[in-house]
Amino acid sequence: MLKKPITDIFFDLDHTLWDFERNSALTYQQLFQDFDLEVDLDHFLEHYVPLNLIFWKAFREGRISKEKLRYERLKTVFERMELRVSDRQINYLSEAYIENLSSHTHLLPNCMEILEYLHKGYKMHIITNGFEEVQTRKLLNSGIAHFFRTVVNSDRAGVKKPDPRIFHMAIEAAGIQPQSGVMIGDSLEADIQGARAVGLQALHFNVHKDPDHGVCPVILDLEQIKQYL
């Protein structure tokens, strides 16, 4: 259980509130049509979804740049699909993906309802490893930006979750003591272990079906937050 009183809630964005997989798939579907690329979307996603997580982990750990992340994840997928796509096309596609991703606004089930519920009793914030220009548009376009008092992203912080410095920046921006806040996110490593390391409480939204870990309470649906807050 969580220790009360809690005054502030810190949310991750992608895979926690904003339906990344669905919005990403819709973006690629649109771009393959626009670029006249004959790519089977389902086959593409079978490769892309797990590879994207691998490349994001490398980016989070500082082993690759965001430019390399954006390019290499597509290049690797097309190579595995044995599709001949030029470097120029990959670069165009990569840039167009970033530009168009935030135009899709699907949220995860019960997201809006739980934000409205929590907004009545808590101050809410975002801590995200996503790119600043994209994450800002996601929040605005999906109609949830007004719920959050502060937004801290890795571009502005100069470090990525689970680095303690990004959490300290968020805690300072919120003006609270760590034990008064709870982090809710999908990544056990980046969100949960990172938050716990600086004294924040945590709720793990286990959308990736990680094994039982005992680090903190686990929820499988955003609606279950009501059991704790």
Predicted segments with their positions:
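N-terminal helical cap/lid subdomain that shapes the substrate entry/recognition surface
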Residues: 2-13, 17-108
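Asp-based, Mg2+/Mn2+-dependent phosphohydrolase catalytic module
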Residues: 1-9, 22, 88, 112, ...
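Structured helix-beta-strand junction loops
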Residues: 51, 120-121
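Short alpha-helical linear motifs
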Residues: 66-72, 112-120, 209
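Glycine-centered short loops/turns at secondary-structure junctions
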Residues: 121-122, 199
